[in-house]
């Protein structure tokens, strides 16, 4: 099985650090982390508009703030390595920078699982544009896309690739997981 993965909130539990970095950009510090997370789980663009943050301010400061947070505070989800080990090929499409992505993977000694990684530095349009997915699908014959947001799964559906929503029952997907220990009974056994 060849799997295309989202990174934040799918392989690694980075949302607490993403929310922390985003909150530093807000002038109103009374806004709850739950409210920020709710918007960020849709997309950063939705959160920027919702909280009335200037896009130029976000672009200039957010990734710098988030990258300063120690990788140890961005752990891999339990049992995700079982799925990574099972797959024949794993690839990533992320809006993170290449350096930040590689730093986290290296910190947790997980870079060896991935054949190819596409980051914001590679020049593809942001998800939900399907360009990066189409490139990886043509090259690696992707069987499944795993992500936690609608924008992660929409490009896969456009390309006719099966989808798996992680910790998000509110989005359309072929499979839904709340934990990766469900992967083999929910995804693999249903495809056998």
Predicted features along the sequence, with ranges:
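N-terminal helical cap/lid subdomain that shapes the substrate entry/recognition surface
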Residues: 2-78
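A mid-sequence interfacial segment
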Residues: 46, 91-112
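Asp-based, Mg2+/Mn2+-dependent phosphohydrolase catalytic module
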Residues: 1, 102-192
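Conserved Rossmann-like nucleotide-cofactor binding loop
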Residues: 10, 17, 98, 151, ...
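Alpha-helix C-terminal capping segments
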Residues: 22-27, 47-52, 79-89, 133-140, ...
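Short, acidic loop-to-helix structural element flanking the phosphoryl-transfer center
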Residues: 68-92, 98, 102, 130
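Conserved SAM-binding loop
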Residues: 11, 90-93, 145-146, 176
């Amino acid at each position: 099985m060849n799997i295309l993965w989202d990174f934040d909130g799918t392989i690694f539990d980075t949302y607490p650090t993403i929310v922390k970095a985003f909150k530093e950009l807000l002038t109103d510090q009374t806004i709850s982390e739950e409210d920020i997370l709710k918007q960020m789980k849709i997309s950063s663009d939705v959160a920027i508009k919702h909280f009335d943050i200037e896009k130029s301010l976000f672009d200039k400061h957010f990734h710098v703030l988030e990258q300063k947070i120690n990788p140890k505070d961005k752990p891999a989800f339990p049992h995700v390595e079982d799925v990574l080990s099972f797959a024949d090929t794993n690839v990533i499409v992320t809006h993170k920078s290449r350096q930040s992505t590689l730093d986290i993977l290296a910190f947790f000694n997980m870079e060896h699982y991935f054949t190819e990684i596409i980051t914001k530095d590679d020049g593809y349009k942001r998800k939900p544009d399907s360009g990066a997915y189409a490139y990886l699908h043509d090259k690696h014959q992707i069987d499944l896309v795993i992500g936690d947001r609608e924008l992660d799964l929409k490009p896969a559906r456009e390309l006719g690739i099966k989808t798996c929503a992680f910790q998000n029952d509110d989005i359309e997907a072929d499979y839904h997981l709340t934990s990766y220990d469900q992967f083999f009974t929910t995804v693999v056994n249903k495809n056998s």
